[in-house]
UniProtKB/Swiss-Prot annotation:
Protein's name in the database: Protein LAZY 1
Tissue: Expressed in the node of the stem, initiating leaf founder cells, young leaf primordia, tips of axillary meristems, spikelet pair meristems of developing tassels and ears, male flower primordia, tassels, ears, silks and seeds. Expressed in leaf sheaths, leaf pulvinus and shoot apical meristem (SAM).
Locus of motif Nuclear localization signal 1: 275-298
Subcellular locations according to the entry: Cell membrane; Nucleus
Main location: membrane
Gene transcribed to yield this protein: LA1
Amino acid sequence: MKLLGWMHRKLRQNSNDVFKEFNNAAGGTCNCITGLAASDPATFLATANEYFTADNDFTNNHPSSPAADLFTFGGSGLLTIGTLGIAAVAVSADADEVDYDVDADADSDFDDNDDTAGDDEDQVDSAVTPTFTYAAPPPIEDATVVEKAAVAVVEAIAEKDDDTTTEDDLMVVSAELEKVLGGRNSGTAGDLVASARVSFAMGVDCPLQGFLFGSPVSDAESRLEQPRDSNGGRRTSLGELFMRTRFAEEKVALVAVEEGEDGGDIGAGGERDDRKAGKGGGGHKTTKKRSAKDEKVPRGDGAQASATVTKSKFHKILQIFHRKVYPESAALARNLTKKSRKRGSGAYHKPEPAASKLRCLKEQRAPGFGCCASRASFGGAASPIDGDDDDELNGSKSGHWIKTDAEYLVLEL
């Protein structure tokens, strides 16, 4: 038995059949997998056929929607999103030889849907994009209509009496004047209507413009619901602040014009008073002349006085508008008025007798610039000024404080 066992092992070691133990029913080292069935091709094909048969049964029980329904609203209509009304084309079997026009097919589909209802099997409904209807915007007013309305408002203001003319009317005319000037400077017709300020003449409701620039002062006071600040008072808008500043500037301009006219009359009256009274008392005579002029107005004829006041008022308004239209000429006239006033004041007030002292100080060499100067800088003992004046200028031997305009002028020179 031992000999047979040894021979059996030798034969198994020298044999090339590696998997012969798999078919050995007696056992061995690979008995764990000997229970598996051999792979039979016929059995495998039968199992696969059963699987695919079950898959076909599932497909028959749950059919998928046709591809045409994806482009219509009858089905899911998923692919109609973003198609913008492009119709789906039913392609026949010989699609390679025939060219289709998408627009023509879409038109034909629309005509068929309007006239007759065709067969659903032959034709595919065209994809229709839903449309939204909006209310028509209000017609935009023509620039000529707006301009005519503005001209009518200005003419109505011009026809008013002088007593009934208010500051709001002046603001309307000023705003229209700024529009015209803005259009003239830009050179475009569209800028004639555009303006950064609130237009008093137009009755157009612009809530955003009213929020940004505020409303007219008269309109703002008449509002029922007004914003309140923390203290309980009405909060002033930015537009009202601009309007108040504008009112203040125009009032200052009117006062300046009145002072200019009074100054001319005062100058003429002062010359007449100087001829009569001589040298002194110029300021006193000027005051008397102004009071006499004020007293003469109510004593004279009422119609003549009112005509004079009317003429002066419109003259002032024209001067304000002229200053806005031609700012360069207004500045030049202002400078000339200042020079004439200086010349007129020079006739009344003679220069002080300290000119000789100033001339002596100019002849000295220029000292150092500062709040004080040394005695040597003013020439010391060689100064042409006497001892008392030198002590007044130089409070101490080290320097002096500048007390008069003449000393400051010497330091500047």
